[in-house]
Every structure is written in structure tokens, then in C-alpha cells.
Amino acid sequence: MEINEIISPYFENGVFTGVRVTVGDEDFVIAAKDYQDGEEIPWYDAMDALYDDDLTTWNYRQACFTMAYFEDINRVLVDNGGDTLDKCYWTCTEHSGNYSFLYDSKHNLIGYYVNFSTCSVRTIKNLKTE
């Protein structure tokens, strides 16, 4: 597999942990597997659980980059034993009072949904230092 400078496998201590995405000033790793085995949870519960576990998920900009490089990201996930992006995933970005953005990987689009509805979560590790 040809690896480009934007999308590449990411390893920690020799173990594949996700896909690194480096675009402009964004540098992040999409986890190899869904958070909590892909359980669908309401947005506020998801954000609380991520906070408690010292984790995060896509911001809006990162979700846009994921959408742009969707096929390459899924190829790296599959080639290294990860799970493809194949669900609706919450982002950490609220749209308005009761709505938050989500990344619908089934249709490769970004939308928003009511916070009390349920979606899956895929964690992100930010590598960019402020």
C-alpha cells in the first residue's frame, strides 16, 4: 500500500492504534476501533464519558478532513486490523442549544442531530501541540 503524507498508519509501542491525518495545522489520529464497542449513546453522555476517560472525538474541521480522505482512512484501518468507519458518529461540536454535529460515515456527510438521540463515538488523539 502506498502511504501518502496526509494519511498514514499510526503505531504506539509497535501496536496499530489508528490512522494519522495530517493536513495543514491539523494533526490527529482516528482510533482503530469504535469507543465502547460502538455503543450508541446520547451526545451529552458521550461527551461526559470521553471527558472522564481523558479522550475526545472529532471537531468539525477534523470531521471534514475525515470525510475528504474517507476511502484512504478506511483502507489503512482495514489493512492494519482496525474497524472501518461505518456508522454515525458524534463530533465534539455543538450546532445549537439541543443539536450537535455528527459525522455520518455511511453516507460520508456531516449533519446535525438532537443531543438526546444516540450515535456511536470514534475517539481522536490530537497530536498538534498548541
Regions found by a protein language model. Give the residues of each.
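C-terminal, surface-exposed recognition/capping segments
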Residues: Y60-E130
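Extracellular adhesion/carbohydrate-recognition regions
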Residues: M1-L55, K87-T91, N98-L102, N115-I124, ...
